């Protein structure tokens, strides 16, 4: 194999005139264009793939979808695994990613399987990922398995990004409003207070209350700030290290009227898609449940999935075990029952995952459209109330003249 092989990203149109895009390995742009033309694809744009699998430093919160997609593309093109690592290392990755690829290449060259090599890097690849790669290695379908993994991870990442994006703007609005209110209370209102000190008349009750609040905050602001930081750190450590507290918090969050339902449906989508991918790859259902439980992302759901596994070990069908768990809604149970009876369990789970992802997407759009004006209204009332409180004595004084 020519060592000059590179990975190229392309955009073009297929025989039906539809816009398509993807990645392909080749020795040169002309080689890639010719290969795509043989597939009926007319290339409009072609460039070397770069930084396609960049991951942030907080690696544990991101899925290696880009890694899977690039590696699958190279393997499908006939590039040997060791050389594929070299090609990916030349595709614009940073120092940490280059070091990871070098270690993977070294481990595989020493005789380890890819799954075993990946398992040495749990901060990058979780148990579910490694197990599915192992299935692909054993069945001789590693490239196809990596493509399926990439699809699953891309869906999961897209849902996570949508959840995060929906919360960013309302959170920024809230923080901005609170910041403006803090400036008014700590900087502006004390100046009005010195102005009102020369008034002989008593201040309105609302104005006096705001001044007292400003005085109290100014006097105790450092203590309140330090206390808030310490409380946040303590709560975070309690959640991370104390299992009963983690379960209690998760139950309270899932019980919230709107956000709880959103997070619950997102967890169901993750469960259904992960289980569908594992089962479709040929992993036995009991083993697949054990792996999916570890990758479920939540203590409450992890316990529920382990109980499903226990129920199946005792002779129950998956749908029967799910029916006994309140975390799994009747629709999901019914789809699983249909899948088990018809031998299409992986397809029914994929349908369930798509359904819950669509539900989350629609609910997020509706929530965002309602939440943003509500926050603006509340913040307007808050800031406007502080301003009115300061001008009430002036209006009162003007009416007496």
Curated annotation (Swiss-Prot):
Disulfide bonds: none annotated. Keywords: Cell inner membrane, Cell membrane, Fimbrium biogenesis, Membrane, Protein transport, Transmembrane, Transmembrane helix, Transport. It is found in: Cell inner membrane. Involved in the translocation of the type IV pilin (PilA). This is Type 4 fimbrial assembly protein PilC. It comes from Pseudomonas putida. Pfam families: T2SSF. Coiled coil: none annotated. The chain crosses the membrane at residues 166-186, 215-235, 375-395.
């Amino acid at each position: 194999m020519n060592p000059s092989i590179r990975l190229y990203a392309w955009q073009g149109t297929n025989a039906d005139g539809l816009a398509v895009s993807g990645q392909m390995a080749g020795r040169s742009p002309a080689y890639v264009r010719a290969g795509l033309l043989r597939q009926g694809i007319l290339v409009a744009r072609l460039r070397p793939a770069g930084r396609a699998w960049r991951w942030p430093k907080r690696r544990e919160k991101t899925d290696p979808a880009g890694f899977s997609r690039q590696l699958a593309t190279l393997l499908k093109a006939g590039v040997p695994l060791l050389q594929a690592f070299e090609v990916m290392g030349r595709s614009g990755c940073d120092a940490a990613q280059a070091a990871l690829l070098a270690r993977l290449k070294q481990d595989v060259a020493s005789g380890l399987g890819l799954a075993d090599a990946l398992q040495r890097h749990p901060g990058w690849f979780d148990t579910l990922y490694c197990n599915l790669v192992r299935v692909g290695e054993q069945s001789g379908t590693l490239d196809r398995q990596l493509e399926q993994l990439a699809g699953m991870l891309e869906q999961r990442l897209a849902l996570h990004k949508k959840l995060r994006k929906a919360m960013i703007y309302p959170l920024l609005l809230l923080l901005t409003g609170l910041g403006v209110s803090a400036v008014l209370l700590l900087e502006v209102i004390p100046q009005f207070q010195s102005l009102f000190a020369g008034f002989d008349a008593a201040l309105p009750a609302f104005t006096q209350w705001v001044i007292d609040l400003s005085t109290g905050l100014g006097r105790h602001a450092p203590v309140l700030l330090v206390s808030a930081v310490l409380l946040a750190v303590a709560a975070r450590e309690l959640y991370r290290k104390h299992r009963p507290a983690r379960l209690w918090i998760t139950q309270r969050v899932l019980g919230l009227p709107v956000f709880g339902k959103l997070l619950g449906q997102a967890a169901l989508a993750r469960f259904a898609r992960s289980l569908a991918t594992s089962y479709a790859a040929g992993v036995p259902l009991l083993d697949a449940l054990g792996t999916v439980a570890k990758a479920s992302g939540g203590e409450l759901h992890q316990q529920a999935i382990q109980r499903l596994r226990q129920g199946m070990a005792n002779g129950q069908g998956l749908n029967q075990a799910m029916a006994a768990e309140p975390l799994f809604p009747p629709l999901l149970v019914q789809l699983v029952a249909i899948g088990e009876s018809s031998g299409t369990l992986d397809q029914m789970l994929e349908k369930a995952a798509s359904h819950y992802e669509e539900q989350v997407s629609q609910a997020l759009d509706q929530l965002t459209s309602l939440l943003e004006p509500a926050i603006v209204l509340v913040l307007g009332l808050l800031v406007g109330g502080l301003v009115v409180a300061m001008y009430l004595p002036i209006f009162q004084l003007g009416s007496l003249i």
